[in-house]
Amino acid sequence: EVLYDGRNFLAMGKKEKTQILMGEVVNNVQDDAVTTRMEEAILAGIGGDPNGEEVVVDTALTMDAAALGQTPIADANTQDSLATITTYVYAHELDFMILEKDVFDYYCNLNAFADLRELLGAGACEALGARIYEKNGVACGITLTDTAFVKQYGITLLDPVIGIVSGSERKEQAVGMLRWIFEENAGVAAAFSAEEYKAMISQEETGRKDDGKNV
């Protein structure tokens, strides 16, 4: 039963939770229980309210990295996954992706990810050091290899990279996730707390509201 109180849809008499972050982890199909633990941990890590907010992570999509270099792309699963991600991106519903490098490069070439130097500032990028992943002169991602995050939540991708989707309208929460993942690195945590970083976030959010065209 779905009810409506004039402002919110309610399921079985309870208000539906507000989604505050959504991500895709491609080629790393997981049990629902593991994905749920990851979602709950991310929500807590970014300071979300478990009673009214939620983080959604989709781990069901698969892509053949070799097929991405074909024209046209013949692999049906890859086609379907590309279409799903494209739909989320154009709807501004997708905030981050965790991908193996070959797949990540495909999306970097489509300018799918925000430039972390512009989004985070020089201090945070310097603190992340060699983990910053560059493609075509853009700091488009951060490598997650050997982090506690990938070990704890069963991410077995070879050289996984995380990127913030350029069209995301929830970049502040996405950056909060990065801060949480690397919180054991004192330099990164300090950089994310710096005034330079706060100014970057404020400027980026203002620009997005002004033009409404950040895709």
Q: What are these model-predicted stretches?
A:
Residues 169-180:
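Short amphipathic alpha-helical coupling segments at ligand-binding clamshell hinges
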Residues 79-133:
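Extracytoplasmic "Venus flytrap"/periplasmic binding protein-like
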Residues 29-94:
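Extracytoplasmic/periplasmic/luminal assembly and interaction segments
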Residues 157-170, 189-191:
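A bilobed periplasmic-binding-protein/Venus flytrap-type ligand-binding module shared by bacterial periplasmic
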Residues 27-30, 102-106, 168-169:
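Solvent-exposed loop/turn segments at secondary-structure junctions
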Residues 13-16, 89-91, 108, 154-157:
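Extracellular/periplasmic catalytic domains that process cell-envelope and extracellular macromolecules
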Residues 125-163:
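Periplasmic-binding protein-like
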Residues 1-26, 186, 192, 196, ...:
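Gram-positive cell-envelope targeting signals
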